[in-house]
């Protein structure tokens, strides 16, 4: 299929070829074609901050990771939109932040203006809240699946546009003016819908009772005929009761027999000769009369003709509405943009966000930054803010060490999320910030094996790391958490060190990087490489207990406190005590004096041996230690 009608040359790019294939498939498989697809635009990757799929997943931008709650995503925090179109657009903005500083600043200007005028913002959001999903309604119009309620929703939504335009006219901003000019009021369409359909129609036109009285003289006549017939039938019951003397006589209707007269068994001797028996039941019999049958034909005929005419009138209205597809779609896009910007302004006001300064530099300075998801979830308690300083020279890489559970991973994720928010045009949870736009964001956070592809946890980790090293640029932001932990200590440390060196030294990389690790040896990079700074997550020790302060401070940590975390997790006390003993042995010497691994010898036994024999134990075959519970 050619897309030349959309302004593309044949086989211009692979993306154009793919779009043509999708459009051809859609036309072949949709019953009513693709008339609602009026525009196809080619977007350059250079326009947007690229976030690879694993980073989108690790950062939980729009979808929670397996086992996480739905409110753990960035989109959940930002999406307080009032329309379905606005919600979908916000999702696109979260997944595809901008790189163009001018466009980012345009959005920031509107968010800031709305934030500073809360009364007008509230009025605008209240007006927008009544607008239905115009994009979906347009699709249904062109597929001939829109029902009467869809058209009423369309009419009520279009009727709110003049109010939206009046509110927007207050603001003197170029982007708002552009959005306002794109809004079409479509009073002719709104009027025709209101003059044709009743205010609360049934879901389907085939149910009847859809068209407003006075819309069609022919329909009014048919309805009048049917109504008169039903009135005649209603009067027939009292008339026949008086004629026959049967007070319990009833006139009913069902779809099988139509109208009928029902007489109980005890009154059958009073049935007139002109009654024709149709059905015998246990307690009664049902009859018809020639007069009743004739009136039934008139009523049913009028009803059927009225329903058929209603369906035709509705389909004509639906086809007429479909001729406004371009204008309705234009309204949907403009309203979605306003709704998304209002949502960002509402979040900025609700959570006390600041406006970041965004430019094309390599600077990334965040003062008092907060994790947006945790900050929103912890409204009743204080989230500990932290600073971030990265640039392309003296602060190119942050090596972050510290205890397990102290908040290293949260902190480095926070940095990526704040950059994404800033490049969306959103305000961010911080005291102040200078954000030099990034071209790509990469994260290597967490890992799990991929059984379906036969890949181990470490293989997945290395594949993600390879993707980062092969695609990062000096304008990228890299977030690394525990590189090399999926293999042996020496292998892992060697890989982590060489990865850090590659990022720092390779001319095509040299990206701003945050590197969280438990390999304390990596902190020595700061001694031999320019641009590396060591930071740690502060803790406070009280005897055998530690308190996590959640504060990022300069310098390297000297402990990981893994045994403390194991204790918090509820490991048996025997395991904790033995772990402390093994750790002490390992820290003293990796290999015991008798060429036995020091892990297998307790310090108490070693001390007793020395006291008894006056020297270290002599070499002898290794003996496996018994279980803790033997």
Predicted regions and their residues:
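Charged, surface-exposed helical/loop "interaction arms" that form contiguous linear patches used
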Residues: 143, 147, 157-160, 213-214, ...
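Hydrophobic/aromatic-rich, well-ordered segments within soluble, folded domains that form packed cores
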Residues: 89, 126-141, 246-264, 560-567
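Conserved catalytic alpha/beta cores of large enzymes that bind or transform nucleotide phosphates
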Residues: 291-322, 429-430, 434
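ATPase nucleotide-binding head domains, primarily ABC-like/P-loop NTPase cores
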Residues: 12, 82-83, 93, 264-292, ...
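Secondary-structure capping and boundary motifs in well-ordered enzyme cores
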Residues: 70, 82, 103, 123-133, ...
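Glycine- and acidic
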Residues: 2-8, 90-94, 114-119, 139, ...
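Charged catalytic and DNA/RNA-contacting regions of genome-maintenance
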Residues: 1-113, 126-129, 133-142, 146-238, ...
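Amphipathic heptad-repeat alpha-helical coiled-coil/stalk segments that mediate oligomerization
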Residues: 1, 50-53, 61, 65, ...
């Amino acid at each position: 299929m050619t897309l030349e009608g959309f302004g593309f040359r044949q086989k211009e790019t692979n993306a154009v070829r793919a779009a043509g294939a999708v459009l051809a498939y859609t036309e072949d498989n949709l019953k009513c074609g693709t008339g609602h697809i009026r525009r196809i635009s080619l977007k350059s990757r250079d326009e947007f901050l690229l976030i690879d799929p694993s980073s989108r997943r690790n950062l939980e931008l729009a979808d929670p990771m397996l086992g996480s709650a739905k409110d753990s995503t960035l989109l959940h925090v930002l999406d307080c939109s009032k329309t379905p179109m606005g919600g979908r657009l916000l999702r696109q903005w979260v997944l595809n932040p901008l790189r163009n500083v001018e466009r980012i600043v345009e959005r920031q200007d509107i968010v800031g203006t709305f934030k500073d005028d809360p009364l007008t913002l509230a009025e605008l959001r209240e007006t927008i809240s009544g607008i239905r999903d115009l994009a979906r309604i347009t699709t249904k119009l062109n597929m001939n699946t829109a029902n009467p309620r869809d058209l009423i929703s369309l009419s009520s939504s279009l009727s709110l546009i003049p109010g939206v335009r009046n509110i927007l006219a207050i603001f003197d901003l170029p982007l708002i003016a552009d959005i306002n000019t794109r809004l079409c009021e479509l009073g002719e369409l709104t009027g025709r819908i209101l003059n044709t359909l009743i205010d609360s129609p049934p879901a389907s036109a085939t149910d009847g009772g859809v068209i407003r009285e006075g819309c069609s003289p022919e329909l009014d006549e048919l309805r009048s005929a049917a109504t008169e017939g039903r009135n005649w039938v209603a009067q027939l019951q009292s008339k026949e009761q008086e004629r026959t003397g049967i007070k319990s006589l009833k006139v009913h209707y069902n779809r099988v027999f139509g109208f009928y007269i029902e007489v109980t068994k005890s009154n059958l001797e009073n049935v007139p000769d002109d009654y024709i028996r149709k059905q015998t039941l246990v307690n009664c019999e049902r009859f018809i009369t020639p007069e009743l049958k004739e009136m039934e034909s008139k009523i049913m005929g009028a009803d059927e003709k009225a329903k058929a005419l209603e369906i035709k009138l509705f389909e004509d209205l639906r086809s007429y509405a479909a001729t406004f597809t371009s204008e309705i779609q234009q309204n949907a896009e403009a309203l979605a943009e306003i709704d998304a910007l209002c949502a960002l302004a509402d979040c900025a006001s609700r959570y006390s966000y600041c406006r970041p300064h965004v430019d094309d530099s390599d600077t990334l300075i965040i003062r008092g930054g907060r994790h947006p998801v945790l900050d929103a979830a912890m409204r009743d308690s204080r989230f500990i803010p932290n600073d971030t300083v990265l640039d392309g020279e003296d602060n190119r890489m942050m090596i972050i060490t510290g205890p397990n559970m102290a908040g290293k991973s949260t902190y480095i994720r926070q940095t990526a999320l704040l950059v994404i928010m800033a490049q969306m045009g959103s305000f961010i949870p911080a005291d102040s910030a200078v954000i030099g736009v990034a071209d790509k964001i990469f994260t290597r956070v967490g890992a799990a094996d991929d059984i379906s592809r036969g890949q181990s946890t470490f293989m997945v980790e290395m594949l993600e790391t390879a993707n980062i090293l092969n695609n990062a640029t000096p304008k990228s932001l890299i977030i690394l958490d525990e590189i090399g932990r999926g293999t042996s200590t020496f292998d892992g440390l060697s890989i982590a060190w060489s990865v850090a060196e590659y990022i720092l030294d390779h001319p095509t990389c040299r990206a701003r990087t945050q590197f969280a690790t438990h390999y304390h040896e990596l902190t020595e990079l700061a001694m031999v490489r320019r641009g590396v700074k060591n930071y740690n997550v502060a803790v406070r020790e009280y005897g055998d207990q530690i308190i996590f302060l959640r504060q990022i401070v300069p310098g390297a940590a000297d402990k990981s406190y893994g045994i403390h975390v194991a204790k918090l997790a509820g490991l048996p006390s025997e395991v904790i005590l033995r772990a402390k003993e093994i750790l002490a042995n390992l820290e003293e010497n990796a290999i015991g004096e008798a060429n036995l691994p020091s892990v297998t010898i307790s310090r108490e036994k070693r001390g007793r041996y020395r006291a008894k024999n006056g020297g270290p134990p002599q070499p002898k075959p290794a003996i496996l230690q018994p279980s803790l519970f033997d």
